Design a protein with these regions (language model features):
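Conserved class I S-adenosyl-L-methionine
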Residues: 43-53
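Short beta-strand element of Class I
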Residues: 68-71
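Mobile active-site "lid"/loop adjacent to the S-adenosyl-L-methionine
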Residues: 106-148
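Conserved SAM-binding loop of SAM-dependent methyltransferases across substrates and taxa
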Residues: 54-66
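Class I SAM-dependent methyltransferase Rossmann-like catalytic core
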Residues: 1-43
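S-adenosyl-L-methionine
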Residues: 75-120
Length: 153
């Protein structure tokens, strides 16, 4: 992190608000806004948060979904959040897919993801890598659309 990036963050109103409200990331407000528009947080659902660390979106989900099953998955560690189970690993590997399947024993109702690829400094390459990650989430969600697993083969 550069000094100019840190200064920019501290001037950002969402950064400040996230710290006051105890959210781990400013992106928590994106998810709150999305839910206000699309109302996908309904009581008693199975929710999967892919690319969850540092946990801002999982925090929001936990606040809205007190009686739901929430599983957060990331290759990076994540500090504990009430009402959220955490699985460290890559959701694209068979081992982690099996663990996700066992965790939900039934269908996944909602998948959320705010993943981005590690940046290289090359904006074009970073964009391509992040788009590839998004496509992997879409492919994963189509596998689990009507329960686990979705086998059309």
């Amino acid at each position: 992190m550069t000094k100019s990036w840190i200064i920019k963050q501290h001037r950002d109103s969402f950064f400040k608000k996230s710290k006051v409200l105890g959210y781990r990331s400013r992106s928590a407000f994106k998810l709150i806004e999305l839910n206000q528009k699309f109302k996908f947080f309904k009581n008693k659902i199975n929710l999967l948060d892919l690319g969850s660390s540092p946990g801002g979106w999982s925090q929001v989900a936990s606040n809205f979904l007190k009686k739901s099953k929430i599983l957060a998955v990331d290759i990076e560690p994540m500090e504990r959040i009430n009402n959220v189970s955490f699985l460290k690993g890559n959701f694209l590997t068979e081992d982690i897919k099996d663990k996700i399947s066992k965790e939900f024993i039934g269908k996944i109702d909602v998948i959320i993801s705010d993943m981005a690829a590690k940046t290289t400094g090359n904006k074009s390459l970073d964009c391509i890598r992040t788009n590839e990650l998004c496509m992997e989430v879409i492919n994963f969600s189509s596998e689990t659309q009507f329960g686990w697993p979705q086998n059309d083969k």
